Amino acid sequence: RTDDCKSNGEAEVGFVGRVLLNAFNAWEYGWESDRAELKENSLKVFDSYLKNGFTEAGFFKEFVNLDRNFEEPVHSIRRQSEGIYAMLHFLAYEKEQGRRHSEWEQRMKKMLDMFMQLQNQDGSFPRKFRDDFSIVDKSGGSTPSATLPLVMGYKYFKDKRYLDSAKKTADYLENELISKADYFSSTLDANCEDKEASLYAATATYYLALITKGEEHKHYADLTKKAAYFALSWYYLWDVPFAPGQMLGDIGLKTRGWGNVSVENNHIDVFIFEFASVLHWLSKEYKEPRFADFAEVISTSMRQLLPHDGHMCGIAKVGY
């Protein structure tokens, strides 16, 4: 809710929460800007999750409501992957500064090892599963979200098993998603064709292109380009008119450069994360300026809803 900004008791590791990534961003910015309160708050988040945020098997407690004493019993490869992704960013940053966090390293290595237990022969990952590894939703559409932490885990831990696992995910993506232009089941608020599956597929193959050379690099780059073109088809090239009284229309939002979500959820969405970086990279890799040009359209359009003095975008409190 933007109209009161009150806490709802929820903490979420991935998807719309990304609490660990928010903590890392605040941690990094806190060091860069000498903001002690940001560093303190970030450490509270990290320490709390290290102490209380793991299940018996060792997965993240990916969604909890502390007001209702509720823990989501079903895990998703999407949220689990995004939690590892955040913590590997934190650990890599800390390593560069000469600091190590052995308990977090052990936790992340254990999770990556458990990921390999979950991976199917065709390279896919189940969309949802329980703490005992039993499968709730076998759909492979969320597979590319796992590629990122596997590549990062290979870089951080120098364990080639993680790179091999990541390459298997790319085989699945190529055979079942990219070659068929059938991107599905990445988002968690619907189970259908969606933008984020193609966006994640492009980002996953981009990670593999960055870490490979020669023909293998070219193959992953070509897959990235193909998936990126499809992902861009979800983005508006025009400004949708709003009816009088709708909040976004009243503050003058222009929709060009915003993406739709899925065939079930017909609304615009800010989700992009590294996709703009992927587009800039593709622009250089293939000497195709349209990729970089549209990345700028996306970036500038989304900044319309960044609140600042005199332009709070309907948000009740400063700092939200």
What kind of feature is each model-predicted range?
Residues R1-Y320:
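Glycan-recognition and catalytic cores of secretory/periplasmic carbohydrate-active enzymes
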